[in-house]
From Swiss-Prot:
The gene is coq7. Fe cation 2 binds at E87, E139, E171, H174. This is 3-demethoxyubiquinol 3-hydroxylase. GO terms for biological process: ubiquinone biosynthetic process. It is found in: Cell membrane. Pathway: Cofactor biosynthesis; ubiquinone biosynthesis. Transmembrane segments: none annotated. Keywords: Cell membrane, Iron, Membrane, Metal-binding, Monooxygenase, Oxidoreductase, Ubiquinone biosynthesis. It catalyses: a 5-methoxy-2-methyl-3-(all-trans-polyprenyl)benzene-1,4-diol + AH2 + O2 = a 3-demethylubiquinol + A + H2O. Pfam families: COQ7. Belongs to the COQ7 family. SUPFAM superfamilies: Ferritin-like. Fe cation 1 binds at E57, E87, H90, E171. Its cofactor is Fe cation.
Amino acid sequence: MVFDELISEFDRGLRSLTGISRMSRPVPAPAEAPAAELTPAERTHAAGLMRVNHVGEVCAQALYQAQKLTARTASAKAMFEEAAREEEDHLAWTAHRLKELDSRPSLLNPLWYAGSLAIGVAAGALGDKVSLGFMAETERQVESHLEGHMSELPAADTASRAIVDQMRIDEVKHGKAAADAGGIELPLPARMLMRAASKVMTSTAYYL
């Protein structure tokens, strides 16, 4: 059973890194067509933001894969699996939008993935309550990050905005579920370290 799990997660990891993630839900569609075409500068900025969001989903896949494999209880495993499945939708949606913007994923995705996998293993090793608390805090920070992107994305980029808004809704749900399942609040130094690491990732991925 453990071997089967490892094979399954290895396959999911390969899909995350090669851009062939499966989506269980269609790409969110904007409520209305854009009033104007994006300017070249707006396309470049939108692509940078969506590349950052794509990297975040690569990291989420690695985190939740590791946390699922190290979870002690069946309920925690199921929660990480459900979150990973929805995050795989996000991964596919952001990859799709990057192609539409004539852009590409981050060149450093293997590095982001490996680092997040190690962090997920470390969180899981501390027990389910800590691991779920890490998930809840991660989702809170991602929610804040996505809200920032909603204010930064060009008003005319209704396609990207529809994707980011649905991602935000999903992240709120994941964070609440993890907290309700018994995830503990992480100490302030841990939360600050997470924000600092996220800042490095987002500022780098925007360009690379």
